[in-house]
């Protein structure tokens, strides 16, 4: 399962330990995956896969951060690891495997997404969007935060993020979208359906 900034893992079985294997990739620069209450730091080098194992013993939300200076947005490169019971985790996996739901009311927003630069970087399962540089947005609105943890995931913050990402996360590589208000409303409405 590919995620961005929010990782869901199952609770390890205390009788028969079941650690979780995590494959780590970086597309842009050196990073270091660090969630202090779960594991030590693991470095990421662009275009080289690295991996780690974690063996969580308690459910909850564990906070982490990139531990390698990686540019102007480094201080806002936050992450969350959700340790869930096996049943909760299995339900989350099932939901993540579903294609994005789109209805006619938001089809204009989907067209905007697929005809602007969004499609070059982002993936939305079940659509023609299969970019690999930015986060997979298939279930964007199931996340608590956007912009690597820089802002709560609300339609208002999403709108601000689309209009000018650098106001939310200085140094962001995402370009500002030059959309009129109607296009911005439609794109935000479309993204809000990706749950």
Enumerate the language-model features and the residues they cover.
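Sec-exported extracytoplasmic/periplasmic mature domains
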Residues: 94, 114-119, 123, 142, ...
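Short, histidine-centered active-site or binding-site loop motifs used for metal coordination
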Residues: 37, 141-142
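Short, cysteine/histidine-rich loop/knuckle motifs that typically chelate Zn2+
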Residues: 68, 120, 139
């Amino acid at each position: 399962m590919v995620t961005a900034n929010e990782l869901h893992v199952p609770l390890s079985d205390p009788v028969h330990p079941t650690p979780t294997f995590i494959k780590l990739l970086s597309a842009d620069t050196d990073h270091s995956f660090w969630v202090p209450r779960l594991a030590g730091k693991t470095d990421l080098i662009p275009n080289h896969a690295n991996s780690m194992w974690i063996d969580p013993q308690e459910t909850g939300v564990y906070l982490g951060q990139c531990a390698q200076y990686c540019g102007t947005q480094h201080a806002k490169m936050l992450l969350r690891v959700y340790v869930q019971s096996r049943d909760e985790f299995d339900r989350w996996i099932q939901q993540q495997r579903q294609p994005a739901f789109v209805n006619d009311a938001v089809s204009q927003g989907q067209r905007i997404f697929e005809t602007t630069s969004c499609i070059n970087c982002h993936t939305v399962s079940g659509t023609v969007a299969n970019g690999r540089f930015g986060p997979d947005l298939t279930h964007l609105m199931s996340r608590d935060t956007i912009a690597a943890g820089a802002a709560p995931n609300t339609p208002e913050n999403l709108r601000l993020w689309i209009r000018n990402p650098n106001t939310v996360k200085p140094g962001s590589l995402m370009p500002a979208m030059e959309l009129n208000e109607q296009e911005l409303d439609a794109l935000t409405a479309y993204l809000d359906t990706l749950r």
